[in-house]
Amino acid sequence: MDLSRRHFLKLGSALGVSAALPACSLLKLTSKEDEYVYQLTAEPAQASLVPGYSTSVLGFNGSIPAPTIRCRQGQKVTIHFTNKLDEPTTIHWHGLRIPIAMDGVPFLSQPPIMPGESFTYEFTPPDAGTFWYHPHMNSVKQLGMGLVGLIIVEEAEPVVFDEEHALMLKHWHLDKKGQWKDLMIPRYSARMGTPGEWGTVNGKHNPQYTIKQNATVRARIANVDNTITYPIAVEGVDAWVIAIDGNPIETPYQLTQHKIGPGMRLDIAFIAPKAGDKVYVRQMKGKFVFPLCEFLSEESWLASDKSIPPLPLNPIAPVKLYQAQEIDFVFEWEGAVTPADKSGHAVPNFWLVNKRAWEGMSAGHIPEPLAKLELGKTYIFNLRNVTQYHHPIHLHGHTFTVLELDGKTLEKPFHTDTVLLGKNGSAKAAFVADNPGRWMYHCHVIEHMKTGLMGFIEVA
């Protein structure tokens, strides 16, 4: 057991949860429990993803899965980042409502971090929950080859579960010998995206974890895949949805099946069954069931009269619908090829937002925003997908309150940073534009983003 793992065991005990995360927590650079200072690198590495074979990957701190960053709601976290890749990169803190200068989007919020350079990210997360971090440059390659990790923001007042497990879902573009296949094939980019063929949870294919009989278990599920939407189901216990995209819901409900698009997260909770029984986490495809991972329950002295502890709500600004301004966003398909760049490479454009394909940006060229919003005002985004493929629509720096899905008004609106639009789907998502800056707004199917389905909004 390495030092970082020992440190996390101590920290987990102090927080009242079992140290059950799949990867060691990132080692803090300070021994003070109320300070969160970390060192993080992006670098080439080797990983055993397909058993018996080694794969060249890109890893945070050379690790697959990446180390989990843990911090606390309302307390400052500092991450000293160094780029050891052979190309520029940045880190985006997905789902966190933090200042624009820390958002990790090249040219829009910071200069690219060049090979060999370092950059310090420093922010105070206002929300607790399950979030993740990834580059926002050459995303098809950098995310596809492994630069994805979790950042878990603990509640300001600790919420005590007996056990906690984090599950990062990803399909890798590998053959049977662990060698890379194409990360992006244009004919698939124009449809659902290019799917990987080797499915993993925390870098392992169909892993098994142990849980204690009668334990209250919190499972933090994160879809860090470039392409695939996972319809999630749990067998063997009654599981309850307690948070969506890091945001607790007021009234937990029993899980039957829940779709998690790329970039999205789902927190579920359950009581571990009797020793010897198993809990199965499944990916559902119609009538077909695909295993993701399983939990084996072991003997324990834990009492059997447990209940799921409630989560406090995050401090999301209440929307003022009576004075909200509505803005329509239509996501559609239109195949085209942009002019070749200086290297002679032609980049396809397949997707449009309000008739515009993302044209890219540089230090000398920032396109016009998709919309200009007034600071402090409530907006309703009317989202409409007029294509045959799913689009998880993600807004940086803000949290949506979803009011309507596919024409149906929700009795209980929920908070999220990513709205999954299905085939010909629609949604009404409201939010208060309370975070000034220029914020990326895009589909989180990475190839869709790469081939046009991206832009930004400006809040001022």
Predicted regions and their residues:
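Hydrophobic or amphipathic alpha-helical targeting/insertion segments
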Residues: 125-154
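Acidic-aromatic/histidine active-site loop/patch
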Residues: 164-215, 222-225, 354
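Extracytoplasmic beta-sandwich strand-turn segments characteristic of Greek-key/jelly-roll folds
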Residues: 64, 69, 95-127, 204-205, ...
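N-terminal edge beta-strand
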Residues: 54-70, 197-207, 350-375
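Asparagine-centered strand-capping/turn motif at beta-strand->loop junctions
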Residues: 81-85, 222-223, 383-387
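Extended terminal and domain-junction accessory segments
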Residues: 11, 26-39, 143-175, 250-390, ...
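C-terminal segment of N-terminal export signals and the immediately downstream linker at the start
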Residues: 23-56
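N-terminal export signals
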Residues: 1, 7-27
